[in-house]
């Protein structure tokens, strides 16, 4: 916290230091070790997923693999931003890498977080097309289309994350503050997401990210999986066990999304609102005790909890979206549209049972189905 957003009076430096010291305690106590563990697991799981994709003999990759690779790359890059953040949060909270690295770390995390959401949405929509509209998918969707959509997704993520380069900055200690230590946190350099005088604009930006980077993709994912679920439930050729397996796979993906990205963005906006209210009142506080007592710890602690829990999604994505296990593809071959268009040769050529096998392009010399060849 740096200055009063009202512009009438500045917040006393000792009030700001006391507030920062109290709030930083939550990060130093639990957040940094969680980030270290998540980094190790996310790098191992997504690195393994990328390795498995790289040794696939079948080329070109069909859209399922293209989107899954983009998701693994975005998760891996996002995980690589966690070690410098953990080192920063480790007491004493001190940024040692310069202002350019501060801005870059914030940008890369936000960009790859948005990329992760975008490619999850692409996977969901591709599953929908492959199962509910298999004729269209097999006739029109090609790997080049998936690569083009992926490129557009990366550009969109970068554009949405670009403002973080402007908002992020270093807060340097006052001259003569001494050496940074646990006993002298006011002498440490802070890497901040935004200064208090920019909180109004930062709140608007956070709302845009919550809407375009979380809400809209969630609605598209829910719509795609809802239509897919209806197709599965109406399929007379599927057993109850197969339907339950599809339902579990879909529900787990939606639950992971709703329990990680959604609360993260909500708590981020609530935390910014709490910061604005405190900064506006700061010049009127009588003493340090009143200033620290006025801190709204609920939104802040909730946001820190989600900063620790949200990266767990990067660790779980390889299991949900990239693992070569029987999933929607093998179950939904009994779906009416899928059954008419599915070709056993597609399963052999893909070498995996990802739910999007139906989107693999048929060979020009082969009929799309027995019905079409008659």
Swiss-Prot record:
Transmembrane segments: 30-50, 65-85, 117-137, 147-167, 207-227, 246-266, 309-329
SUPFAM superfamilies in the cross-refs: Family A G protein-coupled receptor-like
Positions annotated with a glycan in the UniProt record: 4, 179
Tissue expression per record: Highest expression in liver and spleen.
Keyword Plastid: no
MF (Gene Ontology): G protein-coupled ATP receptor activity; neurotransmitter receptor activity; signaling receptor activity
Regions of this protein lying in the Extracellular compartment: 1-29, 86-116, 168-206, 267-308
Subcellular location: Cell membrane
Region (Disordered): 345-374
Highest taxon of the lineage: Eukaryota
Record GO biological process: activation of adenylate cyclase activity; calcium-mediated signaling; cellular response to ATP; defense response; G protein-coupled receptor signaling pathway; neuronal signal transduction; phospholipase C-activating G protein-coupled receptor signaling pathway
Keyword field: Cell membrane, Disulfide bond, G-protein coupled receptor, Glycoprotein, Membrane, Receptor, Transducer, Transmembrane, Transmembrane helix
Induction details: Increased by DMSO and retinoic acid.
A cellular component annotation (GO) from this entry: plasma membrane
InterPro entries referenced in this protein's UniProt entry, alphabetically: GPCR_Rhodpsn, GPCR_Rhodpsn_7TM, P2Y11_rcpt
Disulfide bond residue pairs: 102-180
Similarity annotation: Belongs to the G-protein coupled receptor 1 family.
Biological role: Receptor for ATP and ADP coupled to G-proteins that activate both phosphatidylinositol-calcium and adenylyl cyclase second messenger systems. Not activated by UTP or UDP.
Additional observations: A chimeric transcript, characterized by the first third of PPAN exon 12 joined to P2RY11 exon 2, has been detected. It is possibly produced by trans-splicing. The chimeric transcript is widely expressed and can be induced by retinoic acid during the granulocytic differentiation of the HL-60 cell line. The resulting chimeric protein shows a much lower activity than the non-chimeric P2RY11 gene product, but qualitatively indistinguishable.
PANTHER family associated with the record: P2Y PURINOCEPTOR 11, PURINOCEPTOR-RELATED G-PROTEIN COUPLED RECEPTOR
Protein name: P2Y purinoceptor 11
Source organism: Homo sapiens
């Amino acid at each position: 916290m740096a200055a009063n957003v009202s512009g009438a009076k500045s917040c006393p430096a000792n009030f700001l230091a006391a507030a920062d010291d109290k709030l930083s305690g939550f990060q130093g106590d639990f957040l940094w070790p969680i980030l270290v563990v998540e980094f190790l697991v996310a790098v191992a799981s997504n690195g393994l997923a990328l390795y498995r994709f790289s040794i696939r003999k079948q080329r070109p990759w069909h859209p399922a693999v293209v989107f899954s690779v983009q998701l693994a790359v975005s998760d891996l890059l996002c995980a690589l931003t966690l070690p410098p953040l953990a080192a920063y949060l480790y007491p004493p909270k001190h940024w040692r890498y310069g202002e350019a690295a501060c801005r870059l770390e914030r940008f890369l995390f936000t960009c790859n977080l948005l990329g992760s959401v975008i490619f999850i949405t692409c996977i969901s929509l591709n599953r929908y097309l492959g199962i509910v509209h298999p004729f269209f998918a097999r006739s029109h969707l090609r790997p080049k289309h998936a690569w083009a959509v992926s490129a557009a997704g990366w550009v969109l993520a970068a554009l949405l994350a670009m403002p973080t380069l402007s908002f992020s900055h270093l807060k340097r200690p006052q001259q003569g503050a001494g050496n940074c230590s646990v006993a002298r946190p006011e002498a440490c350099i802070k890497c901040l997401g935004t200064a208090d005088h920019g909180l109004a604009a930062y709140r608007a930006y956070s709302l845009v990210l919550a809407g375009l980077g979380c809400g809209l993709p969630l609605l598209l994912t829910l719509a795609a999986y809802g239509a897919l679920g209806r197709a599965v439930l109406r399929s007379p050729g599927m057993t109850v066990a197969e339907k339950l397996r599809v339902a579990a796979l879909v529900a787990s993906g939606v639950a992971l999304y709703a329990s990680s990205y959604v609360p993260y963005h909500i708590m981020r906006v609530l935390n910014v609102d709490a910061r604005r209210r405190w900064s506006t009142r700061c010049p009127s506080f009588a003493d340090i005790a009143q200033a620290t007592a006025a801190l709204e710890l609920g939104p802040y602690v909730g946001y820190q909890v989600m900063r620790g829990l949200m990266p767990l999604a990067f660790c779980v994505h390889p299991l949900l979206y990239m693992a070569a296990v029987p999933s929607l593809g093998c179950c939904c071959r009994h779906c009416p549209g899928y059954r008419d268009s599915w070709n056993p040769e597609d399963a052999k050529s893909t070498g995996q049972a990802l739910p999007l096998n139906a989107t693999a392009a048929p060979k020009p010399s082969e009929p799309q189905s027995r019905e079409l060849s008659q």
